[in-house]
Swiss-Prot record:
Annotated positions binding ATP: 60-67
Required co-factors: Mg(2+)
Enzyme Commission number(s) from the entry: 3.1.-.-, 5.6.2.4
Identification of the protein by name: ATP-dependent helicase/nuclease subunit A
Gene that encodes it: addA
Higher taxonomy: Bacteria, Bacillati, Bacillota, Bacilli, Lactobacillales
Length: 1222
């Protein structure tokens, strides 16, 4: 029940409906099932919307309508009396929060319109007004609100800012690291610290590898709920725990024993094959068979009796026995077919090899790890202190501050817990432990609503942990009193062809070992409507592989990205879709695993005329040519004796010195000085005191004087003005901003330059003043191999989309191409010198000196890199986590498609047909095989091979070179359409285009039918005007350039938001002005301004008129002076109407129009027409309008019976007025 006050001050009581009971929800589900609605809510959606009073975890598969469920649940809460500001709603991105807010807003508007209860209308209107203040946003945004409000309780000022620029963070980190490094190098334990640095960097001078280690440890700790406690208690957890063979986890030993038993079973299967050859010709056992039987028996015995024969303490002995027992190779060959029986076991043995030696030396690295722990802790504290001093923090800092505030202040925490009716989280699978801790503190323990899908957890690089979702899922299923699990399986996005192939692939691929969830019936995708189940045979998924048999090893490696042949396959399919199916380009999306090395896609698509839009690439802002030129200009202003920057500035388009000029300047050195900078040589060259003054000719001397004068003015201005103004002064003084507009990618270049000025302004506003500090900051960014964010420019809408799989999450597209399926998964992290794990802490490769094991030797030391036991433990977990995330990436990519999905890759056809496993084990690919395969393509081919008897809903097709010729690929059949923006520079263009279309249609009909039917003898003036006047209006037509102009426009902020003035409006205003202009007065700016006030146009159009050009016409041209001299003979904007004979029907028709100006004399007429078209050469417009002026002349001759002796076009669309006689 809610009380409001009406306009008379009287209380209004609103009675809200109670929350639904489980029985009421079941009743609602049954009603929905029996209803005749075309789109029904599923039983699970209804349950997720209306269940209340407990924690709820919604596992929502791709396309299952999770956003719909969230919006409906929020609306239901509001309608039952829960104010919107009492809901905490967390989203993964700002964009998602905006979209969710808009959906709620639309729902509230709709609800207000539907309700007839005045009191409810008032209440809903209040909710609408409160929506903008509601806690709907990212966890980062909420944490900022908490710290801004309660930061004082932990000593944090509310006037802080967020350091979003990674470059700024790295600059501060570098300063802190350098200072701390020097302190540790001079401390009491310096020898241990030096050994630590050498273990990772090789020597103490190059600290880059050690610095990366420290930064990574720091960043990893920041994703935990309490970084300091994690560093103190968990950082060395594995190093303290795993020091003996007995400490090896049981799970790892079980995997080894499982590999041994699997090897024995596979070997037995191979020996039972008919062609194996168990017996010799004499009937006795073959030597091969005897050897293999021994292996089978011993492996089985050792597995069965492991605890008795070996145990954990004898694990190293088991490894030696197995290594000596099995052959060194992986394969057993039967009838020329190779079976990789021993491959998995060899990989497991490698993991445990040299364990005894490793454990002997592992204890020596513990003091190094303690030093590392101390350094990272000290670095974390020092870095935070610097940020507190600057009052500038990272998002993780703010989140930890918020956690600290809520943990240490019971009253604040309880106020939030009492305030929030429910704590709702979207994309819960992508939460990290820091965010989970914050959510726990906000909740009262039984009011959490979490929506996500563990199969779409793909942000491990942001320290997202899918196990948070997984643990909740298990806990709620085992203990329903803790919470309820609701599964949304119905997919409302994709056709059955996409759903079936997704289910087929992941039911054979994903389980808890690899993928973190068993893809069983409760996780499989189900079509949400009957329309999705209608079959389309041409939409069956395709695995298209370029056959690399003929490459002879010359094909690009996986690291080199997608090949030209693969892109050509994609282009061929797109052309087929576009030509044969009429699929618009914007319905097609290409998904890639990373943004790098995709230039070949754009290049190839350009060759075939396929428009493409990318979501960006690597950050290369500071490496763009125009920005590098400006930075070198600023460096020169700051220090002219910087030769590198000075040469770059001289060679730039701003001053255009060539190699010959620079060589002449370089020879003007002072013989008395050993070293002489270029700036000094320029100064000597100007005053003629260089070593060879005769080389400085007059032209070069003039250029040098201009340069020195300009540089001097810039240096003077740099001391007085702001950076922003200095940059714009450079642009204006040397017209550099205008210059780049004439170059390739003009929009991008100008956007980059504009952004440089804005960033300089932002830099100074953040408290850093001066050119020197700005240059230093930029140089530090470059030193740390960082860059600033690229400036985006607007892209065409009708184009194929190219984006990363990560960027596509949450989106959907009719046709999806998953490219580069043969690219190996990045396993860089598992080969680093250290690996971090939340539970185990750090594991490192230790550079041990094993000189003692070698006996007598003359070597001072023998260093060997060893994988310590914690490192091996973390490595195995990281490998499985990486494979699991790649599997989920494939799931995300496939489920983006609405109609059809394509997989594109390359492979050797002959090798891919080799048998990879002797038999399938159950429904899943064998675990060992899934761990070995390192590409999407390998997974798909293995499934196609091992489960070939099933319908997997995708076809494998090899593409040969003969399929990729120009003739085979084909060409787009799309006609080249004129850009409508190129037709707006004058009044006539749009109507001309419309009239030409009409006339073309009429012409075609006249060719097929009797012309008289379509051209009546008598027509009204209004009818004739609609048909013919557009062709004859005195307004120019655009000259369309051979290449269409780009419509891209960067979206940087600008100060003017004036409406765009169309060129056609300017053309109309010019004609009106020429009609009313009093020619009896001297034509000057004042006369033109007075006349301008009398025309019917808005102020923007009047301002856009070039009055100087009009003045120039009357004052500087003979025709303009002719106007003033013979103004009594002048007629302006004169309408006419004449009869014309149709050449086909031989019928007469009326031709009407308006003539801009003509002079009527006793014996002749002079005709004048104004044109505002843009043009390159006047001859173009002369040819275009010759026939039009002939019609005007004919009309005048018929009317006055006098010849038209002169016909002039007045061209006002160029830089100055031009007169063309026609």
């Amino acid at each position: 029940m809610l009380f409001n006050i009406n306009e008379k001050g009287e209380p209004l009581v609103i009675s809200f409906a109670p929350f639904l009971s489980p029985e009421a929800i079941k009743y609602l589900q049954e009603n929905e099932r029996c209803s005749d609605q075309s789109q029904k809510r599923t039983a699970q959606q209804i349950e997720a919307i209306y269940t209340s009073g407990q924690n709820i975890l919604v596992s929502a598969s791709a396309g299952s309508g999770k956003t719909f469920v969230m919006v409906e649940r929020i609306l239901d809460k509001i309608l039952r009396g829960v104010s919107i500001d009492r809901l905490f709603i967390s989203t993964f991105t700002v964009k998602a929060a905006t979209e969710l807010r808009e959906r709620i807003e639309n729902k509230l508007y709709s609800q207000i319109a539907q309700t007839t209860d005045f009191q409810m209308k008032v209440y809903l209107t209040e909710q609408l007004q409160s929506l903008c203040q509601a806690d709907i946003g990212t966890m980062d945004a909420f944490a900022q609100k908490v710290v801004s409000r309660y930061g004082y309780s932990i000593g944090i000022s509310s006037q802080f800012r967020i350091m979003q620029d990674k470059a700024e963070q790295d600059v501060l980190k570098q300063e802190v690291f350098s200072k701390l490094f020097s302190e540790f190098m001079n401390q009491k334990e310096a020898p241990v610290f030096r050994a630590l640095v050498k273990n990772f960097s090789g020597n103490c001078k190059d600290t880059s590898a050690f610095r990366e280690l420290v930064y990574t440890c720091y960043s990893f700790s920041q994703s935990t709920e309490n970084p300091k406690i994690w560093l103190q208690e968990n950082f060395l957890s594995a190093a303290k725990t795993y020091q003996r063979l007995e400490d090896i986890p049981d799970h790892d030993i079980e995997l080894l024993l499982l590999a041994m038993q699997d090897t024995a079973n596979q070997l037995r299967d191979v020996t039972d094959m008919e062609d194996y050859g168990q017996l010799t010709k004499a009937g006795s056992r073959s030597a091969k068979y005897t050897k293999h039987l021994t292996i089978i028996e011993k492996l089985s015995d050792w597995v069965r009796d492991f605890k008795c024969l070996y145990g954990k303490a004898g694990l190293d002995r088991l490894i030696r026995d197995v290594t000596g027992l099995i052959p060194s190779g992986n394969d057993v060959t039967v009838s020329k077919v190779k079976y990789p029986v021993f491959k998995t076991l060899h990989q497991k043995l490698k993991q445990f090899r040299h364990l005894e030696t490793i454990l002997m030396y592992q204890k020596d690295c513990f003091p190094l790890l303690e030093q590392l722990q101390d350094f990272v802790l000290a670095f974390s504290e020092a870095y935070l202190a610097v940020k507190i001093q600057e009052s500038a923090f990272e998002f993780s800092d703010i989140a930890h501050f918020a956690i600290k505030i809520l943990e240490e202040n019971t009253d604040i925490r309880q106020s939030y817990q009492q305030h929030y009716h429910e704590v709702m989280v979207d994309e819960y699978q992508d939460n990290n432990h820091m965010q989970e801790r914050l959510l726990t503190l906000l909740s009262n323990g039984h009011n959490r609503f979490m929506v996500g899908d563990i199969k779409q957890s793909i942000y491990r690089f942001r320290q997202a942990d899918p196990q948070i979702f997984n643990q909740k899922f298990r806990d709620y299923q085992k203990k329903p009193e803790q919470g309820k699990v609701i599964l949304l399986k119905e997919n409302f996005r994709s056709q059955s062809e996409v759903l079936n192939v997704s289910n087929a692939v992941f039911s054979h691929l994903m389980d808890e070992s690899v993928g973190d969830v068993l893809y069983d019936e409760q996780h499989q995708l189900i079509a949400g409507s009957h329309a999705q189940t209608v079959p389309y045979l041409d939409r069956r998924a395709q695995l298209l592989l370029y056959n690399s048999d003929k490459d002879d090893g010359n094909a690009p490696s996986d690291s080199e990205g997608i090949s030209f042949s693969e892109v050509t396959i994609v282009a061929k399919e797109i052309i087929k879709l576009h030509n044969d199916k009429g699929v618009p380009f914007e319905d097609i999306t290409l998904l890639v695993s990373s943004r790098t090395r995709n230039d070949i896609i754009s290049h190839t698509f350009n060759q075939y005329g396929i428009p493409i839009v990318t979501d960006g690439g690597q950050q290369n802002y500071l490496k763009s040519v125009e920005v590098m030129v400006m930075l070198d200009t600023l460096r020169t202003i700051n220090n002219p004796r910087n030769d590198y920057a000075l040469v770059a500035l001289l060679r730039s388009p701003m001053f255009a010195f060539d190699e010959d000029d620079l060589a002449r300047i370089a020879l003007q050195k002072d013989n008395e000085l050993d070293k002489d900078c270029l700036y000094d040589k320029i100064q000597r060259a100007v005053i003629g005191r260089g070593a060879h003054p005769e080389l400085i000719h007059d032209t070069l001397l003039g250029k040098l004087n201009v340069f020195l004068k300009t540089l001097k003015s810039w240096r003077r201005y740099a001391k007085l003005g702001s950076l922003y103004d200095l940059i714009w002064k450079i642009f204006n003084d040397r017209f550099y901003f205008d210059f780049v507009a004439s170059q390739a990618k003009a929009e991008q270049a100008q956007a980059n330059l504009y952004a440089l000025a804005l960033r300089a302004n932002q830099f100074e506003k953040s408290g850093y003043k001066g050119l020197y500090r700005f240059i230093k900051m930029i140089d530090k960014v470059l030193e740390t191999q960082n860059d600033l964010a690229d400036v985006e420019v607007a892209a065409p809408k009708q184009a194929v989309n190219l984006m990363t799989i990560h960027k596509s999450k949450g989106l959907q597209f009719p046709y999806v191409f998953i490219l580069n399926c043969d690219k190996r998964f990045s396993m860089t992290d598992i080969h680093k010198s250290f690996i971090l794990n939340r539970q185990h802490g750090i594991g490192i490769k230790y550079l041990a000196d094993i000189k003692g094991l070698l006996g007598e030797t003359t070597l001072n030391s023998v260093k060997v890199s060893m994988e310590t036991l914690p490192y091996q433990l973390n490595k195995q977990e990281l490998r499985l986590a990486t494979l699991s995330e790649q599997m989920r990436l494939l799931y995300v990519a496939m489920t983006r498609a609405e109609k059809k999905v394509y997989f594109i890759g390359k492979a050797s056809k002959s090798k891919s047909q080799e048998i990879t496993d002797p038999k399938k084990l159950g429904k899943l690919l064998p675990l060992a095989l899934r761990e070995q395969l390192l590409t999407f393509q390998d997974w798909l081919l293995a499934i196609a091979d091992i489960f070939s008897t099933e319908d997997l809903y995708f076809d494998v097709r090899f593409i040969e070179d003969s399929d990729l010729t120009q003739e085979s690929v084909g060409r787009l059949q799309t006609p080249q359409l004129l850009n409508p923006d190129d037709l707006k520079d004058n009044r006539q263009s749009e109507t001309i285009a419309r009239a030409l279309d009409m006339l073309e249609a009429v012409s075609q009909l006249n060719a097929n039918y009797e012309a008289a039917i379509h051209l009546p003898t008598v027509r009204t003036p209004s009818q004739l005007k609609a048909t013919y006047e557009p062709l004859l209006e005195p307004i120019g037509v655009d000259i369309i350039e051979k290449s269409s102009r780009s419509l891209s426009d960067f979206t940087l902020p600008h100060f003017s938001k004036k409406a765009k003035v169309e060129a056609s409006h300017i053309g109309s205003a010019l004609h009106q002005l020429m009609q009313v202009l009093p020619l009896s007065k001297p034509i000057n700016q004042q006369t033109l301004l007075d006349a301008l006030r009398g025309i019917d146009s808005n102020e923007e159009v009047k301002t856009a008129l070039d009055l100087k050009k009009i003045e120039s016409f009357f004052c500087d041209t003979s025709l303009g002076q002719f106007f003033q001299t013979y103004q009594k003979h002048l007629y302006r904007e004169a309408p006419f109407a004449i009869l014309k004979l149709d050449p086909i029907s031989q019928e007469e028709y009326v031709l009407r129009g308006i003539i801009d100006a003509y002079f009527l004399f006793d014996d002749h007429i002079v005709l004048v027409d104004y044109k505002t078209d843009k043009y390159k050469q006047p001859i173009e417009l002369k040819k275009r309008y010759q026939q039009q002026l002939e019609l005007y002349a004919e009309a005048l001759t018929q009317t006055y019976k006098l010849p038209v002796t002169k016909r002039y076009l007045v061209l006002m669309g160029g830089g100055k007025p031009e007169i063309v006689e026609v």
